[in-house]
Regions:
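Juxtadomain coupling helices with adjacent low-complexity linkers
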Residues: 2-16, 29, 113-114, 119-176
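Short leucine-rich amphipathic alpha-helical surface patches
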Residues: 34, 162-166, 170, 185-193
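Structured interaction and signal-relay segments at domain junctions
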Residues: 23-85, 90-92
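Glycine-centered flexibility motif
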Residues: 62, 117, 189-190
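Short amphipathic alpha-helical segments
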Residues: 16-24
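Phosphate-/nucleic-acid-contacting segments
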Residues: 176-200
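Short loop/turn and capping residues at structural boundaries
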Residues: 38, 101, 196-197
């Protein structure tokens, strides 16, 4: 059966574009030993439309789909409900990596692209640990994230945090404290939540 597609709709192009943005974030999270690739299946001879940390495999944008990946694509297209696969492999330099291939679906739920992740298993432990350990003083070190069960709890927590920030700042006059609290909540996007004005 011929499962090939020849052209993407504008909506499907936007879908692929959104995955390209996700590729950057995922690669940054896992570090330089994680390769992330987006394939456009309308052009198998130049299917790689996005690649982050391509130095790991030596590939770049415009590279063709690999034989192994193409084989998995055919299996996914022929098997209902199969939309991802994870496996272990080696590159041409003999370096082992764990790979994941996930289908990117189009408007008619057909596979239009692939979201692929390759994590190299020869990554030194120190390098791996440094990826998840702040080395320099950054803004992210000071972020405290609280997970909540509902948006009301989220809003109330945000309100308490804003109050603490404002009340501890002695340069803010008493008459401006409420204004500053509202300003902080606005900057955090709290007022985009339903019923935020009533709750706050």
């Amino acid at each position: 059966m011929d499962h090939s597609i020849t052209i993407l709709s504008e909506k499907e192009k936007a879908i692929l574009e959104s995955y390209m943005l996700s590729a950057d974030g995922l690669a940054e999270f896992w570090g330089e030993n994680c390769e992330v690739i987006i394939h456009d299946l309308t052009q198998l001879d130049a299917s790689v439309v996005k690649i982050v940390n391509g130095h790991l495999s030596g590939r770049q944008v415009g590279a063709p789909i690999s034989e192994v990946t193409l084989n998995f694509v055919n299996k996914m297209m022929a098997t209902p409900g199969m939309n991802h696969v994870t496996y272990f492999a080696k590159n041409k330099r003999g370096e082992a990596f764990k790979a994941s291939i996930s289908a990117i679906l189009g408007e008619k739920h057909q596979i239009i692209g692939l979201f692929c992740i390759n994590y190299y298993l020869n990554t030194p432990l120190l390098s791996f640990m440094q990826t998840f350990t702040p080395i320099t003083k950054t803004e992210s070190e000071n972020i405290s994230e609280t997970f909540v069960e509902n948006t009301e709890e989220l809003m109330l927590n945000a309100l308490e945090d804003a109050k603490k920030t404002v009340y501890s700042n002695l340069t803010i006059s008493s008459s401006n404290k409420n204004k500053e609290i509202i300003s902080l909540l606005y900057q955090k996007g709290i007022f985009n939540l339903k019923d935020s004005v009533i709750t706050i």
